[in-house]
From Swiss-Prot:
Mostly expressed in aerial organs, particularly in expanding leaves, stems, flowers, and siliques. It comes from the Eukaryota. Sequence repeats lie at residues 168-172, 173-176, 177-181, 185-189, 190-194, 198-202, 207-211, 212-217, 218-223, 225-229, 234-238, 240-244, 245-251, 252-256, 262-266, 267-271, 272-276, 277-281, 282-286, 288-292, 293-297, 298-302, 303-307, 315-319. This is Proline-rich protein 2. The keyword S-adenosyl-L-methionine does not apply. Residues 1-26 form the signal peptide. Disulfide bonds: none annotated. Belongs to the plant proline-rich protein superfamily. GO terms for biological process: plant-type cell wall organization.
Amino acid sequence: MRILPKSGGGALCLLFVFALCSVAHSLSCDVKVVGDVEVIGYSEISKIKIPNAFSGLRVTIECKAADSKGHFVTRGSGEVDETGKFHLNIPHDIVGDDGTLKEACYAHLQSAFGNPCPAHDGLEASKIVFLSKSGQNHVLGLKKSLKFSPEVCISKFFWHMPKFPLPPPLNLPPLTFPKIKKPCPPIYKPPVVIPKKPCPPKIAHKPIYKPPVPIYKPPVPIYKPPVVIPKKPCPPKIHKPIYKPPVPIYKPPVVIPKKTFPPLHKPIYKHPVPIYKPIFKPPVVVIPKKPCPPLPKFPHFPPKYIPHPKFGKWPPFPSHP
């Protein structure tokens, strides 16, 4: 009997080799985006140096794909160097073989704190266009340079470090060490004798030994098998479904440039001249008070005779309470 080999092994090998070749081809492709950043209004802020104005700024590439339903997706980001230039890499999937972009991509400038900077020349000035191609490497760039104002797009904060002079030398006393004294001669003493404790006296009579207490072993136990009580079957466990949270979709903030309004001059209002009108009040009616009737006369009491006073004269009372 003859066993024929299967023909499926060769197809699997060819598929594996094709996958390796596609991965190597995709890794060899390199897509770079280069550009420069320009400062506007530098003469107004003379305290900021040009290398410090670019420190901390970042450039992000936002692309508008067809399957993203009109939303922008971040494809790459990079920092701006001291000369105002930047270069970063983006995925090669969004670039065709002829160098054309499959998606509409734009460059956005961000401050050192991650806030987006306003675009001065509009959105079309920051659009990514094809520049050159050498082999599998594509070089993309911008239509115009990105412009920003240091007043709106804030860079890193640098402290001004003045050159302080060195402190004066310290006037310290000379370093001296204490004198080492010679050791005294040893003093020999006789050893301390500790007296031994006396032993207890010996017992003269002989001890009387009694027979030991007998030890009875317990009887051999008889083991019986335990009564098996059948358990009721438990109900089947109900596994709760595990709901995974949805994948968050981060939307980049829409940059709305602020509208400039003309200055408003507030009108100056003056208080009008007050017009005082006289207020006429009715006269107060005074009701005369009726006279009170005359009080009756106080009856006359004869003076009380006291043979002798019990107390002396009282001191005079004050007139005020």
